[in-house]
Amino acid sequence: FIIGFFMVKELSAEEKFELIKRNTVEILGEDELKEMLKKGEKLKHYIGFEISGKPHLGHGLVCMAKVKDLMDAGVDCSIFLADWHSWINDKLGGNLEIIKKIAAGYFKRENSRFNWF
């Protein structure tokens, strides 16, 4: 097999800001965000999905593309699968076991971890 090596360029604060801003409508506190990036502060982001069935292209293309931008900008990202919200909103018949089974199929990578609340 072939192993490839490549250099990863450290992004400037401005480059990180542009990644974060890409394909967004609005950023509240742009100046504060720029200052945090200049200072090298660690940023965190989370996004949550109510489980209502199998994921669709909007999840994969739009939401995950933005998560990738954030991760590329050095932001620590968490993705929450809102099983409890799905249950109380009677998604998938309100069956928590089915909800968890469907949710577990959203991400099949070995490094995915599921915390059920």
Task: Name each region found by the language model.
Residues 52-55, 59, 95-102:
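Short secondary-structure transition/capping motifs
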Residues 99-117:
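A glycine-rich helix N-cap at a beta->alpha junction
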Residues 33, 68-75, 102-107:
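Structured alpha-helical segments in the cores of large, soluble enzyme domains
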Residues 73-83, 114-117:
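Short, flexible active-site-proximal loops enriched in glycine and acidic residues
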Residues 2-52:
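Non-catalytic terminal extensions that flank enzyme cores
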Residues 80-100:
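A glycine-rich phosphate/pyrophosphate-binding beta-strand-loop-alpha-helix module
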Residues 50-54, 84-87:
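Short active-site-proximal "capping" loops at secondary-structure junctions
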Residues 57-79:
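Histidine-anchored nucleotide/phosphate-binding helix
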